[in-house]
Amino acid sequence: MSTTFNPQVDLSWSGSARSVRRLGDNWEPLRRLYFLDFPLLLLSVGLLTWVFPTDTMLVVSSSVGAFVGFYTLWEVVVRRRPIRFAHFFCIANTAGYGFGVLNSWLTISRGDRGLAEFFNRDAEAVSRAMAAVLISSGILYALGEIYESPIFGSNFKLNFDNRAVAFIFFGTVLIIVGYLTGTMGYMGTSQDSGGHVTVLAGLLAWLFPALFAFTCLTYLAWPKNALKSAIGFALIVQFILLVPTGRRGILYFIVMALIASRFSSFRPTWSFFKKIIYAFILVIVIFVGALTFYYLRVAGWGKHKVSLVDRISLAIDLFESGNTSKANEGFEKNLQKRTFILGYLSDLLDASLRMPTAMGKNALHEFQLVIPSAFWEDKEAFLYQEESVANTQFNFAYKDEANSLYTAGAIDFGLWGMVLYPILVCALFRLLAEFLRVNLPEMVSTIAILALLYNSLVTEAGLWVHLLAVRNAILFSAFLWICFKMPALALKHPPQKGAFLR
């Protein structure tokens, strides 16, 4: 395709020379697959599903969404194609909702019942919710490919030095301190008695995904020596510390590590057989980590406020007893049912078609949630969740559901909110990433942007979670800047260009 016509928005501050653009400047031309083919496919299947909302069309639309989402992810991870926030949000929603439905449909024994009926949902409402996901994603795919310039140029490679290693070790120690002080534990970071998240808890929750990806990247780029082994050990420690935070976190962290590996000079030349072996090992690692987390969950059943140390002890006792059939069966059933996260969204969208919507009240409340407590003395009075807004607006009785950008949009503006909210948050992320790119050193801006990319890849992240990621990126980038402000020490064996230069 000719590159003479390229309407992408160039988000560069005035005065920045194109030849020295931070994070690379070699961009691929527009790809028809993403500004035309995929959008048309998603829009056409979505419209058909909306007009014919049956259980069969639910499976068809979910399959199409899962295929498009995973293909986009494969292109980013394996083929190292351009990274855009728009496409990451599309991956999160098409693969998250689509594969979730497809997995439950394939694995649950339902007899003659449809999937929606099995989950006590209306088939038409569930089908139309999946249709809305495809329609919204189709629009975002096209807008992202046309108007959002890639964050990283295809020629971008990070320059590593002693400061990168110091940051890895310091960050790993910080995570350990978080566990020792109770700031982190089972299911991630904890809150104080007033429901507030401490500064350390907020820092660790924001930093951990990017730290893990950056550690993997540094390990691949570092030459073979004792320090490389130390980096590898830190990576193993981080993975062990990751397991108690949740199964989805394990998957997302590893995906982000694979994406970050593109920023080094490391290029695997493995045979096809070796690639299969390594992929199989990776799947085993994810499975073992997820199963370990589930054992930690089972160990706490029937008990009140079980500490992480007690959970680990009880989980070990459970495993050594050999009486794990109930836990394994529960793990299997959980994998079958937990992925069906479309039900809550379908209820909200269906209600929004019949009843007045919140008209932005939910968005305003979720914005209030991310205001630091230091600036709002009685903030705890407003610490209710999205479900409370939905319950008040639509007369539901939800307690804890799968929040997302789509559910926030459906509460406020119905279908139009599902289309609009991802676009607005994507634009906000891209503007912030550009600000970080221009004003911070490459190493610091890359880590901060990796944290934003991680957030955009998570399906079950409500509007306030995305706004929190923006707030934390602004606040905690100063912490990263300080970490990398220390002087760089000369390396004993100067590396080749593209591995470490500073």
Give the role of each language-model region:
Residues M187-S190, V197, L353-W416:
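Long extracytoplasmic/lumenal interhelical loops at the membrane interface
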Residues L40-L48, A92-S104, T172-L180, F233-V243, ...:
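Aromatic-anchored segments of alpha-helical transmembrane domains
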Residues F214, N395-R502:
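Hydrophobic alpha-helical segments
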Residues M1-I151, V255-L258, R262-I286, L468-I482, ...:
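N-terminal "leader" segments that precede or initiate the main folded domain
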Residues G15, M57-L58, R113-F119, Y141-G302:
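Membrane-embedded catalytic interface detector for glycan/lipid assembly enzymes
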Residues F52-T54, L241-R248, T459-L467:
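Membrane-interface helix caps and helix-loop-helix hairpins in membrane proteins
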Residues I277-E380:
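Aromatic-rich transmembrane-lumenal/periplasmic boundary elements in polytopic membrane proteins
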Residues L42-F52, R110-D122, T183-A201, A397-Y406:
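Juxtamembrane membrane-water interface segments that cap and precede transmembrane helices
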